[in-house]
Amino acid sequence: MEQGGSGYRIEIAPNNRAKCKGSLCGRSKILAGTVRFGTFVDSGRFQSWAWKHWGCVTPRMLKNIKNRLGEDDIVNSLDGITALSQEWIDKVVDAINEGHVSESDERESRKLGEKMNVNSQKLKTSSPPKVVRKNKRHHTTVKSVLSDSDLDAEFTDGSEAYEDD
């Protein structure tokens, strides 16, 4: 883990490309200028960072950070923390020591998730989708996707599908 150091990193997002791996925000994009928390991932084929909004960091992650880095010198052990403002450094150290992020940061992540849910709601259709298939005898089968049996299938005469040209 030569690139990852401790395996954890906190920084200000330089761009809007990363998506949050947390579920609290609905996996929304991490906007440029916001604080993000990364976990180093080494899959064998590639190495990368899995990013989360600071408000999406779970108590279990904070416990693992505390166990790996120790309580004594979090500021010197956590990658990227020294580039943050003193206010954010205090916030991060307090969260690691307490075992959870502050309520206000969690609220911000929940707001992102609510915005995403409102924007991504789809209109409900009145009828379920249908699948149309042709079998070997050129019969057209129309069947509801939701039905489990062929009892709902409708058969038509195959002669109308193939007329002389």
From Swiss-Prot:
Gene3D superfamilies noted in UniProt: Zinc finger, PARP-type (3.30.1740.10)
UniProt biased composition (Basic and acidic residues): 100-114
InterPro entries: Znf_PARP, Znf_PARP_sf
Zinc fingers, PARP-type class: 8-100
PROSITE patterns: ZF_PARP_2
Cellular component, GO, one term: cytosol
Compartments it resides in: Cytoplasm; Nucleus
Comp. bias (Polar residues): 117-128
Ribonucleoprotein among keywords: no
Protein's name according to its UniProt entry: PARP-type zinc finger-containing protein C13F5.07c
Organism: Schizosaccharomyces pombe (strain 972 / ATCC 24843) (Fission yeast)
Lineage of producing organism: Eukaryota, Fungi, Dikarya, Ascomycota, Taphrinomycotina
